[in-house]
Amino acid sequence: MIIFPAIDLKDGQAVRLTKGLMDSAKVYSNEPYELAKRFEEMGAEWLHIVDLNGAFAGEPKNIEQIEKIRKNTNLKIQLGGGIRDEDTIKRYLDLGINRLILGSIAAKNPKLVSELAEKYPIAVGIDAKDGFVAIDGWDKTEGILAKDLAEKYKDSKIECIIATDISKDGTLTGLNIDFILEIQNASQKPVIASGGVASEEDIKKVKENNIYGVIIGKAFYEGKIDLQNVLRENA
C-alpha cells in the first residue's frame, strides 16, 4: 500500500478545503515546496498535488509552485487540477511529473481519456457527491453514478483510479470504505482512497482491504496522524 501525502495549491499556498468548498480554504504553508521536502524526509516516496485554482479554471494555475516542488525533491509526483488536454499533459511530463490525474475530462469523455492512457501515465480521478460524479472543481454534478464511470475504465490502460467521497473530504470523519470498494470492484483497477481519513484506523482499513493507496491531507496537517510513523509502518 502506498501512502500519498497531499498538497493542495491555491494562490501559490498549500491549503486544505472542507468538502471541496473554495471559501473554506485554510492555509498551512506559504512555501509548499518546503512541505514537500518534509514529506520526503519523513520517508514518503510519492506526493499527491492538486492545483485547486486550475481545477476551477480548467487550466494550470500554480505551475511556479509545482516546478519548485519538482526541483527541490526527488519524490514521485501525481498531479491533478485543470488538466483537460494533451498539451497540458505533455507540459507537465516535461516538467518531470510522474502521473497525471484527469477528472472532469475523464467523466465527460472516457473514450479520449482511455486513448490518452495508451500513451501517457494517467490516473482517473472520480469524485462523488451522493454517489454521483462531480466535475469542474466539484462545482457541478454529472448525472452519472461513480461506479458506472469506474466501470467504463475496466479495459483501459489507466494506472489507477483516485476515488474521493466529497462529503467526507477535509472533514476528518473517517474514510467511506464502502465507496472505495465499490469503485475498486466496478473498475477492477488499483484504487487510491481519498476523503475523510481521520486516523491510523482508516489506514489499517485500507490495508486490510488490499487497496492500492491512500491520500493523507488534513489528518496530517491537523496532527491527527503521525505521518512519519505511518510511512515507516507501510514502507
Swiss-Prot record:
The keyword Isomerase applies. It is found in: Cytoplasm. Pathway: Amino-acid biosynthesis; L-histidine biosynthesis; L-histidine from 5-phospho-alpha-D-ribose 1-diphosphate: step 4/9. Its EC number is 5.3.1.16. GO terms for biological process: L-histidine biosynthetic process; L-tryptophan biosynthetic process. The active site is at D8, D127. One of its GO terms (molecular function) is 1-(5-phosphoribosyl)-5-[(5-phosphoribosylamino)methylideneamino]imidazole-4-carboxamide isomerase activity. Keywords: Amino-acid biosynthesis, Cytoplasm, Histidine biosynthesis, Isomerase. GO terms for cellular component: cytoplasm. It catalyses: 1-(5-phospho-beta-D-ribosyl)-5-[(5-phospho-beta-D-ribosylamino)methylideneamino]imidazole-4-carboxamide = 5-[(5-phospho-1-deoxy-D-ribulos-1-ylimino)methylamino]-1-(5-phospho-beta-D-ribosyl)imidazole-4-carboxamide. Belongs to the HisA/HisF family. This is 1-(5-phosphoribosyl)-5-[(5-phosphoribosylamino)methylideneamino] imidazole-4-carboxamide isomerase. The lineage of its organism: Bacteria, Pseudomonadati, Campylobacterota, Epsilonproteobacteria, Nautiliales. The gene is hisA.
